[in-house]
Amino acid sequence: MGILIPLVSVSAFWAIIGFGGPWIVPKGPNRGIIQLMIIMTAVCCWMFWIMVFLHQLNPLIGPQINVKTIRWISEKWGDAPNVINN
């Protein structure tokens, strides 16, 4: 359920821009180009957002910290006996 609200709301926003944006372009010699630019902008922005959003849901590689670094951090933060002995 937590993924559904941002997915639908952001997708709806870019769909409104992509479908509604070309209708507000005034008539002129470059109307077709401007309409295409609006549609392509909406598609590219949505694709960039959806790729970043979906890749954050299930990352392939998690953060990796050296054991030496973990011990140094635990010593500096004052939790050394609990972390090092486990």
UniProtKB/Swiss-Prot annotation:
Give the Lumenal membrane side ranges: 54-86
**GO MF, one example:** proton-transporting ATPase activity, rotational mechanism
Q: Coiled coil located at which positions? A: none
Mind telling me which residue stretches traverse the membrane in this protein? 1-21, 33-53
Q: Which UniProt keywords apply?
A: Cell membrane, Hydrogen ion transport, Ion transport, Membrane, Transmembrane, Transmembrane helix, Transport
Give the matching Pfam families.
Answer: ATP_synt_H
An example GO BP is: embryo development ending in birth or egg hatching
Instruction: Give the Cytoplasmic compartment stretches of this protein.
Output: 22-32
Q: What happens when the gene is disrupted?
A: RNAi-mediated knockdown causes hyperfusion of epidermal cells in embryos.
Q: Give the highest taxon in the source lineage.
A: Eukaryota
The membrane topology term of the UniProt record is: Multi-pass membrane protein
- Where is the protein situated, by its record's location annotation? Apical cell membrane
- List, alphabetically, the GO terms of the cellular component aspect: apical junction complex; apical plasma membrane; plasma membrane proton-transporting V-type ATPase complex; proton-transporting V-type ATPase, V0 domain
Family, similarity comment: Belongs to the V-ATPase e1/e2 subunit family.
Spell out the subunit comment.
Answer: V-ATPase is a heteromultimeric enzyme made up of two complexes: the ATP-hydrolytic V1 complex and the proton translocation V0 complex. The V1 complex consists of three catalytic AB heterodimers that form a heterohexamer, three peripheral stalks each consisting of EG heterodimers, one central rotor including subunits D and F, and the regulatory subunits C and H. The proton translocation complex V0 consists of the proton transport subunit a, a ring of proteolipid subunits c9c'', rotary subunit d, subunits e and f, and the accessory subunits vah-19/Ac45 and vah-20/PRR.
Question: What exactly does this protein do?
Answer: Subunit of the V0 complex of vacuolar(H+)-ATPase (V-ATPase), a multisubunit enzyme composed of a peripheral complex (V1) that hydrolyzes ATP and a membrane integral complex (V0) that translocates protons. V-ATPase is responsible for acidifying and maintaining the pH of intracellular compartments and in some cell types, is targeted to the plasma membrane, where it is responsible for acidifying the extracellular environment. During embryonic development, the V-ATPase is required to repress fusion of epidermal cells probably by negatively regulating eff-1-mediated cell fusion.
What is the name attached to this protein's record? V-type proton ATPase subunit e
Give the originating organism: Caenorhabditis elegans
